[in-house]
């Protein structure tokens, strides 16, 4: 009898996910990409494009998740409230013109507003040797930091991570299996919260780089519900020569549409 119940529950799960049209949100946005999801309770991978989920690209600002862990663990900053002084200038050709972030800024605000200049300054203090040590220990990306002239190898150069690797990293982060202290985990989990309701907590980070003639956009994170956790990584890629005003918004719109179809989000 127990076996029948388990099989019935698995059938319901498979049927529910099978009814989800994972390609529809991409068609509606008119853009190519993929969403990779891991159902923690059922140990089930869900792909909109499994082949794409294995292809590594620059992580862009999604790297701020592991970057925040590293700067805290190494003591480069004390906590999320430590303020980094504004450096006075930034390369607007590389990073765009964003006057709203040109001021002294805490780590918490820098994460929320994705202020790249803050993390560039912190990266200079960490150095690539220490980065490589943590990246290897965390199994994060290809650990190739060559090809970037500046400190932000996560936006420019050869460094790359696949959507599936993003998800496995987030799962290890959630389980606190990585080489960081409990305090460091708690701080980063706090600053990652983007939405909290009575039913779920959403922790996530966006990313967008314009390197190599392409726009590469990300949204990665996880949704904690009372009975399960769902990890996700959505990546969109388009030629820079092909305009799409919805590119930035579609990172979130596509992901949320899929998660709503799966009844993960309200």
Task: Indicate where each model-derived feature is located.
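Beta-lactamase-like hydrolase cores
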Residues: 16-53, 58
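Short, well-structured active-site flanking segments
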Residues: 73-90, 180-185
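Mid-domain, small-residue-enriched loop/turn segments at the edges of structured enzyme/sensor domains
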Residues: 99-106, 121-170
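Flexible glycine/proline-enriched surface loops and loop-helix/loop-strand junctions
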Residues: 49-54, 103-105, 112-119, 146-154, ...
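Bacterial Sec-dependent N-terminal signal peptides
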Residues: 1-21
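Structured C-terminal helix/loop/strand segments within mature extracytoplasmic catalytic/sensor domains
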Residues: 20-25, 29, 124-129, 174-266
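Active-site SXXK
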Residues: 57-83, 110, 166, 232
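Acidic helix-start/capping segments at beta-turn-to-alpha-helix junctions
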Residues: 82-99, 126, 152
